[in-house]
UniProtKB/Swiss-Prot annotation:
InterPro entries: BOP1/Erb1, BOP1_N_dom, WD40/YVTN_repeat-like_dom_sf, WD40_repeat_CS, WD40_repeat_dom_sf, WD40_rpt. GO terms for cellular component: nucleoplasm; PeBoW complex; preribosome, large subunit precursor. Residues 30-44, 57-79, 87-159 have a biased composition (Acidic residues). Gene3D superfamilies: YVTN repeat-like/Quinoprotein amine dehydrogenase. This is Ribosome biogenesis protein BOP1 homolog. Residues 1-195, 207-240 are annotated as: Disordered. HAMAP family: BOP1. Disulfide bonds: none annotated. It comes from the Eukaryota. It is found in: Nucleus, Nucleolus; Nucleus, Nucleoplasm. Required for maturation of ribosomal RNAs and formation of the large ribosomal subunit. Belongs to the WD repeat BOP1/ERB1 family. The lineage of its organism: Eukaryota, Metazoa, Ecdysozoa, Arthropoda, Hexapoda. One of its GO terms (biological process) is maturation of 5.8S rRNA from tricistronic rRNA transcript (SSU-rRNA, 5.8S rRNA, LSU-rRNA).
């Protein structure tokens, strides 16, 4: 088909009387004068080549490195290819060089008969390659196949003429092999690719168009109305095949796919051929110059004629719409010429020549404003402006203006009004207001003391108002009224309205006061009866508990495992771990005995050192008095108790409720509430001696505490707390909590503040440097408080009671003595159960961590962290 077109072009050139010129290619245009006739063929081919070069951005073909196949003609932008022999010899070059225009005309006349049988539709289109329909939508597959067969026949004829015909059998075999590889989707071997290259180069044809040539625009006869929805109401989003969105596609360079379709399936990358495949496609595919690669799917898309035309119009700076008429006749809707005759000739209305009523009302308002002085005339305005511009004079002293104001009373307060007369002052009062003889006699007796009288007059009754005589006390009452107005001071009292919210102190948020225990972490189970007491080792690794099941248990804190159980033979009411970290010793109050137990936990050398220290009793030169020997006895332990860890037994004459250690770990005190003046006894471990500090009973003693720094002893009775100096043996202070029964107390690590719990649900904070009365009382429990405790390191304190709750509070004590302690309740931990109206018995803090332990009537010990 292409050859036939070229021959037709050459024939037209011969008819136009062009001079014969030698040509070097069969596809080269013959003469410049023939540009108008073949503007839709040859220029379009050069346009195709230039557009292909701009898309590929290549100066020359990558496969044509030596320039053997293609030759550029600088005069015409048309690419021509030379046909090579299979041996690589250039035979046609000499023959084509000698070809004249007469020979071309002769060949065109011989082919006239063949051209008559061609399809008429070929002349209407610029090129069959540039059809709008894609291969999937084209219905004329049979016509395309027939065109391809005609092209192949023409190529074979030309090859025969040039002496390049190949054996048909070898060509059929090569096509069969190519079809086999294409059906298996496998790349072609190099020999088949080279064979296809030879077939392509044998024809020496390449369809091109010029870049400056536009496809023919269909002629329009008038402007027909177009339906904007004729092509279908679609959107850009529906045509998108890859759903990855607007992202850089180089993110998928390392993967086998380039995204996902609407069914969430991977879009596999298209296979990329090598340079040979690219060259074959460039030579064979007539749509190669208009084929672009979709960056989102990797598929090759063939641009239609409309797309090519749109690109060319945009590149040349023209309107993208091909149907838009740039030179459409202008319609001047509004003329610029001045009309000499009136457009409308309506007669004037009556109001156009009558005076306006609105202006009449406005003038009336102006006149009224001038009469009232609100509006100034021009002369008046000039006079006021002249006065304003005159120099102004001021008084030297400001008091000259304020003489009249000084004569007046500043902030005058009105005198109180007199009381209105009552029923007793009436001329005809009711009978009950009249005096009887007894009341009249009493009124007369107070003549010397008139201010004590119930009334300053005697009520009288008259029949009519005419019978009322003159008032004898009128002048005197007027005079007293004047004295009141003159002498009685009057002033205004400013009352400050204070809201209830201002009386409540502003406390910080608990979030700002962390860390403090918030959740239950571990539960220590093993006792069979209620647990009354608990104590923690100074290093914070073990705890000891005492219970009504007559046992003392040693627990490991981190695992909640019971390490050792020591039976005592009686109810254990108090346990205390020795605060001295150099020895491992626990004091337990069980019945009338105090047991000093080596728990045998922790450092082995420390356990052995404790046993060596308690093995032999030191010799004492002093002799205890009779009242001490009758109250307490230091005894040895049996073999069974020794195996359990008991080292020393101290027997008292009454039941021991509490045992507490001194800070150094050598002294400890015991409390026997029924012991009268011997209720409190202090024992020395190093000398194995005991002493009674008091000679008289001051009340029923509940508990005692040693001061953490000073040699002081705090003794709590039912209603008072006494502070004794152990060196001077004097009472230093007596605290008055104002309660009926004290249950427990704890002292701050610094020693300046004391915490007291009562059976009356009240928690009291004492500042020992401030007062002997409570600094603050907290009513945060709903039942009796059993135990209170301070944390050794953190500003925390806790209280436990029979309402199942352990309340952790923030108690900050400042070094500045002028600043009061800050007390903020933080957390209520309510996990224990109520058994026989009892719940939580004891509470104690961990020595180093913000943890708290509690023991209760439900036979458990709970750790809160």
């Amino acid at each position: 088909m292409v050859a036939n077109k070229e021959r037709a072009i050459k024939r037209k050139a011969s008819e136009g009387g062009a001079k014969p010129e030698p040509i070097t290619s069969k596809q080269e245009p013959l003469d410049e004068s023939n540009d108008e006739d073949n503007s839709n063929e040859s220029d379009y081919e050069s346009d195709k080549e230039n557009l292909l070069g701009s898309i590929e951005n290549e100066g020359e073909d990558s496969s044509d490195s030596d320039g053997e196949y293609a030759t550029d003609d600088d005069e015409d932008d048309v690419l021509s290819f030379e046909s090579l022999n299979s041996d690589g010899e250039e035979e046609d070059e000499e023959e084509d060089a000698g070809t004249t225009l007469e020979e071309v005309e002769r060949e065109a006349e011989e082919d006239d008969d063949e051209e008559d049988g061609e399809d008429d539709e070929e002349a209407d289109s610029a090129d069959d390659v540039n059809s709008d329909s894609s291969p999937e939508e084209d219905e004329g597959d049979l016509e395309d196949s027939s065109d391809e067969e005609l092209e192949e026949e023409e190529e074979e004829e030309e090859a025969k003429e040039n002496g390049k015909e190949k054996p048909a059998k070898a060509k059929a075999e090569r096509k069969q092999r190519e079809e086999q590889f294409e059906s298996d989707d496998e790349p072609l071997p190099d020999d088949l690719k080279l064979g296809r290259i030879e077939d392509v180069l044998g024809t020496g044809e390449k369809k091109t168009r010029g870049l400056g040539v536009f496809p023919p625009v269909p002629k329009r006869k008038g402007k027909a109305a177009q339906d904007e929805y004729a092509a279908g109401d679609t959107s850009d989003e529906e045509d998108i095949r890859n759903t990855v969105g607007n992202i850089p596609m180089h993110w998928y360079d390392e993967y086998k796919h380039v995204g996902y379709d609407w069914d969430a399936k991977k879009i596999i990358k298209a296979k990329k051929g090598d340079a040979i495949d690219d060259f074959l496609q460039r030579m064979e595919d007539p749509n190669f110059w208009r084929t672009v690669t979709d960056p989102q799917t990797g598929q090759k898309v063939v641009l239609s004629d409309e797309d090519i035309g749109l690109i060319k119009r945009i590149m040349s700076g023209r309107n993208p719409d091909a149907e838009y008429d740039d030179y459409e006749p202008f319609i001047e809707w509004f003329t610029s010429e001045v009309e000499k005759m009136p457009i409308r000739n309506i007669p004037e209305s009556k109001r156009s020549f009558l005076p306006s009523k609105a202006e009449k009302h406005k003038i009336g308002r102006y006149v009224h404003a001038l009469k009232m002085g609100w509006m100034k005339t021009m002369a008046e305005k000039r006079r006021l402006e002249a006065i304003r511009r005159q120099p102004k004079f001021y008084m030297l002293w400001t008091t000259d203006h304020g003489k009249e104001e000084m004569r007046r009373i500043h902030d005058h307060v009105a005198a109180p009004k007199r009381m209105l007369p009552g029923h007793a002052e009436s001329y005809n009062p009711p009978p009950e207001y009249l005096f009887d003889e007894k009341e009249l006699e009493e009124w007369n007796k107070l003549a010397n003391q008139p201010w004590k009288r119930k009334r300053a007059y005697v009520p009288q009754k008259y029949n009519s108002l005419r019978e009322v005589p003159g008032y004898t006390r009128y002048v005197k009452e007027r005079f007293l009224r004047c004295l009141d107005l003159y002498l009685a001071p009057r002033m205004r009292r400013s009352r400050v309205a204070v809201g209830a919210e201002y009386l409540i102190p502003k406390l910080p948020s608990p979030r700002d006061l962390q860390p403090f225990p918030t959740l239950q972490n571990l539960i220590y189970t093993g006792h069979t009866s209620l647990i009354r007491c608990i104590s923690v080792e100074p290093k914070g690794e073990y705890i000891v508990t005492g219970s009504d099941d007559m046992t003392v248990k040693i627990w490991e804190i981190s695992t909640a495992r019971c390490i050792r159980t020591i039976p005592t033979g009686d109810i254990v009411r108090s346990v205390a771990w020795c605060p001295n970290s150099k020895i491992s010793l626990v004091a337990a109050a069980s019945g009338k005995r105090v047991l000093l137990i080596n728990p045998k936990v922790g450092d082995y050398m420390l356990v052995k050192k404790t046993d060596d220290l308690l093995t032999e009793a030191p010799r004492s030169d002093t002799v205890d008095s009779e009242r001490i020997r009758s109250a307490v006895q230091w005894g040895e332990v049996t073999e069974e108790e020794k195996k359990l860890g008991v080292r020393i037994v101290i027997t008292h004459f009454r039941e021991v409720r509490q045992v507490t250690w001194h800070g150094r770990g050598d002294y400890f005190a015991t409390v026997m509430p029924d012991g009268a003046y011997r209720s409190v006894m202090i024992h020395q471990l190093s000398k194995r001696r005991s002493q009674v500090p008091f000679s008289k009973s001051k009340g029923l003693i509940q508990c005692v505490l040693f001061h953490p720094i000073k040699p002081c002893l705090f003794v709590a009775t039912q209603r008072h707390i006494r502070v004794y100096d152990l060196v001077k043996q004097l009472m230093m202070k007596k605290l008055y909590p104002g309660c009926k029964w004290i249950s427990s107390m704890a002292i701050h690590p610094k020693g300046d503040n004391l915490l007291i719990g009562t059976y009356e649900k009240r928690l009291m904070w004492f500042d020992l440097d401030l007062s002997t009365k409570p600094y603050q009382q907290l009513r945060i429990h709903n039942a009796a408080i059993r135990s209170v405790a301070f944390h050794p390191r953190y500003p925390l304190f806790a209280s436990a009671g029979d309402d199942r709750s352990v309340i952790v509070s923030h108690g900050m004590v400042y070094n500045d003595l002028l600043q009061n302690p800050l007390i903020v309740p933080l957390r209520r931990l309510k996990n224990h159960a109520v058994v026989n109206d009892f719940s939580v018995f004891d509470v104690v803090f961990h020595p180093t961590q913000p943890w708290v332990f509690s023991s209760g009537a439900d036979n458990t010990v709970r750790l809160y962290t």
